[in-house]
Amino acid sequence: LTAGHCNRSGEPSKVTMNLGGVLPYATLGTFSQTISEGVHDEQHDIGLITLDGDNVPQSPAIAASVPVSGVAANLQVGQQLCKFGMGSGADACGQIVEITGSKVKFLAGGQCGDSGGPVYRYENDGTVSAVGILIRGGDPYTRKAGCAARAKFSVAELVRPWLDTWRLTMVTAASAPR
């Protein structure tokens, strides 16, 4: 899953990524579903990439090192979430300030290019639970800053509703082939 606005509108397109020198600009797959309704309230922004590239390393982990144990349940305002963005090149964490039926807003900074990255919650056992896909950020004091200013908060599209809608299963550290 990724942010829908990361796809070219109206067409399935190939997804390529520079995987840190391991597979420079390897084809990962193809967008098979894209919903990019806008950037307001409950408008959805989600894309499904079908992994069909050759030699795509698949790891049920964040940044290839922190195992994903499942999908987070019972999110609450005040809990800490983290996100990883390719634009930032690092993770950032902050408290949840708002939860809706399809989104979660939390106080983690970011920048353009972070969209589509994972949003997760650290668990007591050292694993993380998947929460959402980063779709946008903002600054309540700078309206329409675009990429000119670093975001002060992040918004994620929750993954659970889309896993259910598209009948997908989360690959976790426990379920991954060994």
What is each model feature region?
Residues 1-100:
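Serine endopeptidase catalytic core focused on the charge-relay Asp
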Residues 10-15, 115-120, 141-148:
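A short, polar/proline- and glycine-enriched secondary-structure boundary/capping micro-motif
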Residues 27-40, 48-65, 131, 135-178:
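C-terminal cap/linker of serine protease catalytic domains
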Residues 47, 103-106, 128:
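Hydrophobic residues embedded in beta-strands of well-ordered beta-sheets
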Residues 83-85, 105-109:
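Short beta-strand segments that buttress and anchor functional surface loops
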Residues 88, 103, 137:
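Residue-level detector of flexible, active-site-proximal loop/helix-junction positions
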Residues 109-134, 142:
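Catalytic nucleophile loop of clan PA
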